[in-house]
A protein has these predicted regions:
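Helix-start/capping segments and mature chain N-termini
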Residues: 1-76, 93-257
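Long amphipathic N-terminal alpha/beta scaffold segment
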Residues: 78-96
């Protein structure tokens, strides 16, 4: 169960506070960022906000001064005196902007992936059509489990993260049909070449490692797949990718907004 520190909603046209609405299931977009430390830092903040603005325009949310207003609400709701280790979510539709902060869950070392036949709607954008994914996740202890989204017998991503797989000392990711998150995009530039490949469920046994990458989880190694024979054979590339992300975290500066 997520523990929320903050849940606020505002009318987009005048920033007047209204009753909180998480906006799930509606026509709109969102982003989730990791906020941490005192005098808060937000990992990949600029990229998250720019991508949110770009996605909002694609969804017809063309509010004047949108970025400026987002910053105004963040200044109002975040404190330099508080030590954070939370996930900051900003969601938008044409009328409402919602901001929430929930505690970042500590992921167990032996994460299990549970495969479900499900595909994100319009995966090129981080949109709010997310209720089916949330329903599946609500039935699990998300510190120990995640769901692997399967479409046409191919593994695309998880309910929370992008997915990387390792075979013969090469890193692979699905070709298409998934949302490419900000953490994934950043690490993709820093890692050895990532080969694009359709990841069929019946070929998972060929891979030595399955690694999840996302804002909420960071970098996590999957230990096994529920009701599947696949089990982790190595941690080599998990360790490599973790070091790359740790380097990015160390470079993260206090946010000035």
């Amino acid at each position: 169960m997520a523990i929320f520190l903050l849940k606020k909603s505002y009318q987009l046209n005048n920033l007047k506070e209204i009753k909180f609405n998480d906006l799930w299931g509606g026509h709109g977009v969102f982003t989730t960022m990791w906020i941490f430390d005192k005098s808060f830092k937000i990992l990949f903040f600029k990229d998250h906000i720019n991508n949110l603005i770009k996605s909002a325009k694609a969804y017809g949310i063309n509010t004047k001064n949108l970025k400026k207003n987002i910053f105004k609400l963040l200044r109002k709701n975040l404190s330099n005196s508080k030590k954070y280790n939370h996930l900051l979510r900003i969601a938008l539709n044409k009328k409402v902007i919602s901001i929430s902060l929930r505690s970042k869950i500590k992921i167990k070392n032996n994460l299990v992936l549970k495969l479900v036949k499900l595909k994100r709607q319009k995966p090129e954008y981080k949109n709010l059509k997310y209720k089916e994914i949330l329903l599946h996740l609500s039935k699990l202890d998300t510190s120990k489990f995640d769901i692997g989204l399967i479409s046409n017998k191919k593994l695309l991503e998880t309910g929370t993260s992008n997915i990387l797989l390792v075979k013969d000392k090469k890193i692979y990711s699905p070709i298409k049909g998934f949302y490419k998150g900000i953490t994934f995009r950043t690490l993709e530039k820093k890692l050895p070449k990532i080969h694009k490949k359709n990841i069929y469920v019946n070929q998972l046994h060929e891979f030595d490692e399955i690694i999840l990458v996302g804002s909420g989880k960071g970098v996590v190694s999957v230990s096994k797949i529920y009701e599947n024979s696949w089990k982790r054979k190595s941690l080599n590339y998990y360790n490599l990718i973790s070091k790359v992300l740790s380097s990015e975290i160390k470079k993260c500066k206090k946010i000035s907004i």
